[in-house]
Amino acid sequence: MSTLTIDPTSIPPLEGKTAVVTATPLVPGGASGIGLAAAKIMLQKGATVYALDRQEPIEAVPGLKFRRCDVTSWSALREVFDEIQQVHLAFANAGICDKSPESYYDDVCDNGNLQEPDYSMIDVNLKAVLNFVKLARHSMRRHQVQGSIVITASSTGLVPEQSAPVYSSTKFAVIGLVRTLRSVLIQENITINAVAPFVTTTGMAPAEAMVPLKNLGVQTSPADFVGLALVYSAVARQTRRVEAYGKETEEDILEHGRWNGRVILTLGDKYTEVEEEFSKSRPLWTGGEVLQSIRLQQAVLDFRHGGVAIKSNRPSNQLN
């Protein structure tokens, strides 16, 4: 894995850029969330920043433009993008945790029948992210801007966390979204990346809740440390691509360009980019023959270069 050095000087001036960040509430006691931390950094660099959330910040942040928005509502998100129009930097940061870590494992019954678990996390952590990314891409293409999309994932989307199965699953999914879209959006002058925070002090995980973890030696990060990784992911450069896809060759990997398709793990005071080494290791855990078949399938279906589109003759409601 690649260790990164990121500090405020890593972020260029952002005058003339417009950013949209979801879920940026200030919480009592002076703590702030990851999204708000990213928003403050961009404001300091001269960007115009819109914060989207259900609740307005409890204290004013100079220059921050607040828009009340339920990120789980397609129409509400669409209205915001229609209003702002030209968006250069889009941060899908909204997320919620399991209300009870044991809830998925509990056998809660109603009249003797097992109750369906609360899946509101899927609406916020996955469906809202899918909608946000789609709307951001549409806006960036329509206005022909050089765009960047960054998703707040989680370390639990990289390694298993048995105490939060649904939360972890949603974070695995959004990292999968980055891997899926990175070879497509870049051709539209749009990058997509993610940041996967380990334990971070935020409104969802206040400082007092971190004390037992710190006493056990668990490393934690402040919100502004993670927020800096979000902004870096939107503006950084790279000396090679993460991987070749479809009909691309291995030589294509060596192309310099904008930071794209990458995931930064934040843990304590360290930044680690994980996707490049993960991609390099693929032959080890798939085997050469399997990987060759995967690449062949990608090449056949690579619609960027005239690939075959697979469609089913069955009605959509009959698809497995």
Swiss-Prot record:
InterPro entries: NAD(P)-bd_dom_sf (IPR036291), Sc_DH/Rdtase_CS (IPR020904), SDR_fam (IPR002347)
Coiled coil: none
Keywords carried by this UniProt record: NADP, Oxidoreductase
Tree of life domain: Eukaryota
Pathway linked to the protein: Mycotoxin biosynthesis
Record has Transport as a keyword: no
Gene3D superfamilies: NAD(P)-binding Rossmann-like Domain
GO molecular function: oxidoreductase activity
The enzyme's E.C. designation: 1.-.-.-
SUPFAM superfamilies per record: NAD(P)-binding Rossmann-fold domains
Function: Short-chain dehydrogenase/reductase; part of the core atranone cluster (CAC) which products are predicted to catalyze most or all steps of mycotoxin atranone synthesis, starting from geranylgeranyl pyrophosphate (GGPP). The initial cyclization of GGPP to dolabellane is probably performed by the terpene cyclase ATR13. The Baeyer-Villiger oxidation near the end of the atranone synthesis, which converts atranones D and E to atranones F and G is predicted to be catalyzed by the monooxygenase ATR8.
Family, per entry: Belongs to the short-chain dehydrogenases/reductases (SDR) family.
Protein name in the entry: Short-chain dehydrogenase/reductase ATR7
Source species of the chain: Stachybotrys chlorohalonatus (strain IBT 40285)
Higher taxonomy: Eukaryota, Fungi, Dikarya, Ascomycota, Pezizomycotina
Gene name for this UniProt entry: ATR7
